């Protein structure tokens, strides 16, 4: 049966990203948010929110939900109004559309006919429907009716690592497979007006943005038709951090997606991340965490700061994660793939010798509900100028 399996590791062959056109400037967002939610009388809460936004290190975000949508659906701005139907009516349409835009860019970079795509993986925490966003995305792209689909709902911020793990397994166990993996989240699911008793909501309103990212994964790249690897997917792992239950969560309720984020999350991640690194890199013989490149989900400034401090990392290790956080906010599952895209582009622009900032080996980390950590060991490829 080995002849049915690919030889060699799977690689990322192309990356595409997409965002809604509507842009939110972070400095202006507190005034906007309290105005459109008719909450300007809550002056003390607004000042708290302004401080949260100021500390976020986010410059701007993209957001599908604009003021026109809120005028058409005025109940969305109420804190506890039953608005799940209205939110889902929008998201079941918009999530596959934004995902399709990212997929189209990845397919264009890949340069091969879309008929060669054998598998489609889609993840989103924004919506749930049957048939799912995978089905609608496949139809929008005009993929073969026989493309093998996997739909994963409600993974949250670790989903970017999950799709790479599953895409790797599929590509390596099905010779000739080309896997299109896409993450898309639109935060209209959690936009609500403020409440004095719900400060976690304010954190979510301050950091989350909308985005989609897609990768094409395959083993044995066919260079005769122009396929080129960007990163090899060497190994993958997933773990639940100890004593972390209830620290990150999301709950679908009549008012939409209710977001939980405990203040101990940065500490929990920073205290446990080295164990993940040791398990992943001991087989390779690497123990210097500054000797690898980093593709880290920027869940927030505090997480990056704590990990950087705990592992004594050089400032440049998180430059791509911080850039994506600044320009887009936390886009949930797609964010870490935006960081991957930023790293390979910056490596080329700065004349680095590899797609991994000049380093051979690297790690991709996704963090999310559970508290779940996805770890992917990557190998960069040389850049030929």
Curated annotation (Swiss-Prot):
EC number: 2.3.1.-
UniProt enzyme class: transferase
Tissue expression notes: Expressed in glandular trichomes.
Entry's Gene Ontology cellular component terms: cytoplasm
Active site (record annotation): 157
Annotated InterPro entries: Chalcone/stilbene_synt_C, Chalcone/stilbene_synt_N, Chalcone/stilbene_synthase_AS, Polyketide_synthase_type-III, Thiolase-like
One of the GO biological process terms: polyketide biosynthetic process
Keywords tagged on the record: Acyltransferase, Cytoplasm, Transferase
Keyword Cytoplasm in annotation: yes
Subcellular location: Cytoplasm
GO MF annotation terms: acyltransferase activity, transferring groups other than amino-acyl groups
Domain of life: Eukaryota
Presence of keyword Cell cycle: no
Protein's job: Polyketide synthase responsible for the biosynthesis of secondary metabolites.
Family listed: Belongs to the thiolase-like superfamily. Chalcone/stilbene synthases family.
Protein name per the record: Polyketide synthase 5
Organism name: Cannabis sativa (Hemp)
